[in-house]
Amino acid sequence: MKPEYLSIILVEPQGPINIGSVCRAMMNFGVTKLRLVNPTKHYKSLLAKKMALTAFTVLENALIFEDLQSALSDIQVAFGTTRRFGKYRKNFFTPADAAQKLNDAYQDVRSALVLGPEDTGLETKDLDLCQHFITIPTHDGYPSMNLSHAL
């Protein structure tokens, strides 16, 4: 998968520290396209800048959307992240399997990784807009991950 074809979409990210951390993680892997859906009004604060460091350019160039459907309008395939196994969601990828799928089947396709709010994750209506689902195996006693760590 070519990094220039991949967008990271954060749905209603709440904390500028997490947003800055996501920018830094993105730059570590050459991914520079960030889309924010209804972010906190302080998403470009000094805290975000401190966490992003030189990756703050990712945040400065981020596209802002009111809803996920708009953010996905030019995306051909979306991978939604979730820790919840719904009754109709059957095909989950691990991060490694999702990376392999992106590399094998979607190399020249505009793709997105979609992550939800820190406190609730993606809602069903948002997951319904995604073609694939990713879940990260974690300890049953504490399955929720920090936004930047999930990325």
Write out the residue ranges for each language-model feature.
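Post-transcriptional modification and biogenesis factors for structured RNAs
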Residues: M1-L151
